[in-house]
Amino acid sequence: EISCSLVGSEMCIRDRFNADTFFNDCHPQLKADFIMANPPFNLSGWGQDKLLDDVRWQYGTPPAGNANFAWLQHMIWHLAPNGRIGMVLANGSLSSQSGGEGEIRKNIINADLVDCIVAMPSQLFYTTQIPVSLWFLAKNKKQKGKTLFIDARKLGTMVTRKLRELTDEDIKRIADTYNAFVDGTLKDEKGFCAVVTTQDIAKQDYILTPGRYVGIEEQE
């Protein structure tokens, strides 16, 4: 038995078998105010053929070879009317056009759900070198029709030859940037952050790679 506390909520995990969220949604009626998730990256063979007409695929059926947009839509399905998501996904989800992923991403963007995308630095994980980004989505965004892009790939400090960590200052910089965006006071910073309208994202074929929008850092 494993007991733990997360953000003030107690959980107890007893089952020794792995769960399957797609086929056995343990909380089918849940509408959450906040969701945090770090699902498996680029999972293939997740059972798409048995879930083709699932109600969770509001923005398009995810491809059989990659569950990234299945995870994303599962979380969106469980959001409350003012709910928010913070999620880690492999960078491929920002730009992939294969298996209908580009169309799903387009539909999610046009639904005005994407609040912020943060490109993270490499070597943050012990077990994989897959580059990742943070997706922040919201059902009732304060900044309508706009998305914040942050390129944080240069942040962090190497604590071993293979592992990088974000410092408290790095985390504060990202958080302060997001908070300024929500407040409507943020100014774009070349090479680091930019606020982009949905119309301008559409002009970029609905690709969400931050580097495409923040530009190159100005040299002194």
Show which residues each predicted segment covers:
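Conserved SAM-binding strand-loop segment of SAM-dependent methyltransferases
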Residues: R14-A19
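Single conserved hydrophobic/aromatic residue that forms the stacking wall/gate
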Residues: E1-G8, I13
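A conserved structural/catalytic subdomain of Rossmann-like adenosyl-cofactor enzymes
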Residues: F23-E220
